[in-house]
């Protein structure tokens, strides 16, 4: 990057901030401390800090973004939404971990892409931007929306034991991104984006 004078953008996750209590109004802010709760989020946090060190120590022209949960067509089936969809296609009842009350802030992948593009073109060097589309839904609600897309009953799923250390809620305050770049999501209606994904 330094040798070629290349602009660097590092894409990360909101999981570096830990999780929030269900029902509280607070959302993650760019200056929040890192409190990762898994090996994955710890490694992502470490990579963010490495980029910040490159900026400070070597003057690398870089920005960082921490994004909420992506969804959209052709996502890898290990993820929650495509796994639920493919299970229904294959005749397998979807599974919901624990009560399903865990909240995620969903963003369509195309909106994530345009946000990154705007940061690359309009963002300030050395800054961190949080990408989210104000799409908070709990996992039970998302499962039932997918079931409805398939014409299935809202209770046509199985509850399974919750995962150890399952984060409760993610929510992004995207105001810095919006104010500095003018970005806005195209998929403001999660139901429409979910329908697009299923189709």
Regions found by a protein language model. Give the residues of each.
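Active-site Tyr-X1-5-Lys
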Residues: 3, 19, 35-63, 88-89
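Conserved Rossmann-fold NAD(P)-dependent oxidoreductase catalytic core, especially the SDR/UDP-sugar
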Residues: 1-37
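Structural signature of beta-strand start/N-cap positions in the alpha/beta core
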Residues: 7, 61-63, 127
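C-terminal substrate-binding subdomain of Rossmann-fold SDR/epimerase-dehydratase oxidoreductases
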Residues: 88-199
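Conserved active-site beta-strand element of glycosyltransferases/polysaccharide synthases
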Residues: 62-64, 95-96
């Amino acid at each position: 990057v330094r040798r070629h004078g290349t602009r660097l953008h590092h894409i990360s996750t909101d999981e570096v901030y830990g999780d929030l209590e269900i029902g509280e109004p607070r959302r993650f802010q760019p200056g929040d401390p890192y409190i990762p709760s898994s090996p994955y989020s710890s490694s992502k946090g470490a990579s963010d800090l490495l980029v910040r060190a490159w900026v400070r120590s070597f003057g690398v022209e870089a920005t960082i973004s921490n994004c909420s949960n992506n969804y959209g067509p052709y996502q890898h089936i290990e993820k929650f939404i495509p796994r639920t969809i493919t299970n229904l296609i294959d005749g397998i009842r979807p599974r919901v971990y624990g009560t399903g009350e865990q909240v995620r802030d969903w963003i369509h992948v195309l909106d994530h892409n345009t946000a990154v593009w705007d940061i690359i073109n309009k963002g300030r060097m050395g800054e961190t931007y949080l990408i989210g589309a104000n799409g908070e839904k709990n996992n039970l609600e998302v499962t039932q929306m997918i079931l409805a897309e398939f014409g299935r009953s809202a209770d046509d799923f199985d509850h399974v034991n919750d995962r150890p250390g399952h984060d409760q809620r993610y929510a992004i305050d995207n105001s810095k991104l919006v104010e500095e770049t003018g970005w806005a999501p195209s998929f403001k209606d999660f139901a429409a984006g979910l329908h697009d994904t299923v189709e």
